[in-house]
């Protein structure tokens, strides 16, 4: 008669030479294996070593007002006023909620709040063309609030079991951005770009991954709605013998972004062409972009996002395509404007860099023509400046002027040796 092998009551593994199983000593039919015993011991050690003061510090995130948050966005993001207002309110409410939920009953400033009401979080969906400022807004406020941020592309994510990146790896990136501090990561921001590319109706289909995109959406739903997730601290695929870190996603702010090409058609069909200014017009890209401000959750479901995911993205706002005038401002006005960055680089080597107005406008026109938005400005600048940058160490004491011809026709810029200002002695 074969002896029945014992199984671990926690992981259901059979007893083996390298994984012995012991009885609990209390209940006859309850067993625990060596692996689960080690994991349990590590978890208990973590709880015993917790420093309550550190936990409180992790929760104590500064919460500037929505006006202060928008003012910070105004320093780096040109235009998009409505989107910046909505985003600022959403971020303010999110971190105010975390602070309120962490207060004890005695710490509540108002007796009305002492009623066991727990505030739920509102994640954000930003709809707008490539290079319109979606990622920059999230990065700017994360830096301002001194919280970690992880940025992922939804097109690289796959359902468990397919070739590609596990959805949980987003949280691994966030943990790494928090320098391994779990508590800090649990109050961070996750930005998922190109969320529209994993719609159930996506044309980008492949036999090597979930063809509908719904599996990836379901996997995202689990972490977005708030749950405790086991992640490998160094990323990669999960396997039974590796160590995991537990992250609670309940207080992580998820921001999703996408261009949603074709969404305007869905909105127009729903409205029946009864929107002022669109009835009887010839369809164009500008018309579709203008229609996006009328977007409703049902339109996004028709586009191919699952209702459960839309139900977790409570704050929806749209960003407009960037005009030529706005593109020129992006190049020159923000604190970290590209023109200012290049001028700083030249200053370090003792040279002075000037851009003629026509040159800046030409850069903006090229970015619009390439349909890359503000994101494409740097590559245009790099292409136009590469030869000059190569010679830069020998240009100390020169004034260099970039003209329209330098940008459009690759002509060499004007280089003039600066005159030394020698004062005569009296």
From Swiss-Prot:
Keywords: ATP-binding, Chaperone, Metal-binding, Nucleotide-binding, Zinc. One of its GO terms (molecular function) is zinc ion binding. The keyword Chaperone applies. SUPFAM superfamilies: P-loop containing nucleoside triphosphate hydrolases (SSF52540). Zn(2+) binds at residues 8, 11, 33, 36. Residues 1-52 form the ClpX-type ZB domain. PROSITE patterns: CLPX_ZB (PS51902). The keyword Membrane does not apply. ATP binds at residues 129-136. One of its GO terms (biological process) is cell division. It comes from the Bacteria. GO terms for cellular component: HslUV protease complex. HAMAP family: ClpX. Component of the ClpX-ClpP complex. Forms a hexameric ring that, in the presence of ATP, binds to fourteen ClpP subunits assembled into a disk-like structure with a central cavity, resembling the structure of eukaryotic proteasomes. NCBIfam families: clpX, PRK05342.1. ATP-dependent specificity component of the Clp protease. It directs the protease to specific substrates. Can perform chaperone functions in the absence of ClpP. Belongs to the ClpX chaperone family. This is ATP-dependent Clp protease ATP-binding subunit ClpX. The gene is clpX.
């Amino acid at each position: 008669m074969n002896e029945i092998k014992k199984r671990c009551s926690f992981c259901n593994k059979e007893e083996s030479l390298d994984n012995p199983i012991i009885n609990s000593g209390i209940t006859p039919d309850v067993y625990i294996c060596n692996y689960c015993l080690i994991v349990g011991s590590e978890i208990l050690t973590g709880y015993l070593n917790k420093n309550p003061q550190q936990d409180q510090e992790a929760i104590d995130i500064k919460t500037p007002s929505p006006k202060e948050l928008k003012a910070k966005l105004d320093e780096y993001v040109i235009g998009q006023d409505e989107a910046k207002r909505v985003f600022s309110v959403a971020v303010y409410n999110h971190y105010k909620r975390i602070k309120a939920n962490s207060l004890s009953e005695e710490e509540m400033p108002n007796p009305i709040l002492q009623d066991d009401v727990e505030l739920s979080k509102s994640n954000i969906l930003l709809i707008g063309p490539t290079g319109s400022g979606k990622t920059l807004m999230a990065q700017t406020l994360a830096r301002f609030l001194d919280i970690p941020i992880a940025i992922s592309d939804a097109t690289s994510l796959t359902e468990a079991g397919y070739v590609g990146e596990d959805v949980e790896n987003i949280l691994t990136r966030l943990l790494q951005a928090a320098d391994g501090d779990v508590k800090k990561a649990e109050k961070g921001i996750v930005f998922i770009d190109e969320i529209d590319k994993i719609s159930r109706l996506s044309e980008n289909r492949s036999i090597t991954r979930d063809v509908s995109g719904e599996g990836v959406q379901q996997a995202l739903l689990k972490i977005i709605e708030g749950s405790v997730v086991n992640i490998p601290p160094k990323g990669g695929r999960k396997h039974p013998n590796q160590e995991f870190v537990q992250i609670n996603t309940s207080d992580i702010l998820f921001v999703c972004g996408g261009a949603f090409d074709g969404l305007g058609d869905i909105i127009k069909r729903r409205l029946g062409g009864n929107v002022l200014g669109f009835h009887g017009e010839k369809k164009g890209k500008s018309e579709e972009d203008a229609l996006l401000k009328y977007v409703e959750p049902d339109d996004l479901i028709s586009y191919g996002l699952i209702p459960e995911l839309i139900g977790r993205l409570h704050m929806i706002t749209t960003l407009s395509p960037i005009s030529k005038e706005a593109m020129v401002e992006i190049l020159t006005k923000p604190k970290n404007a590209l023109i200012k960055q290049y001028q700083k680089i030249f200053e370090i080597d003792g040279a002075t860099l000037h851009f003629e107005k026509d040159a800046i406008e030409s850069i903006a026109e090229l970015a619009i023509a390439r349909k890359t938005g503000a994101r494409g400005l740097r590559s245009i600048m790099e292409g136009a400046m590469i030869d000059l940058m190569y010679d830069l160490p020998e240009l100390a004491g020169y004034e260099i002027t970039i003209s329209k011809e330098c940008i459009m026709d690759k002509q060499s810029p004007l280089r003039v040796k600066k005159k030394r200002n020698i004062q005569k002695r009296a």
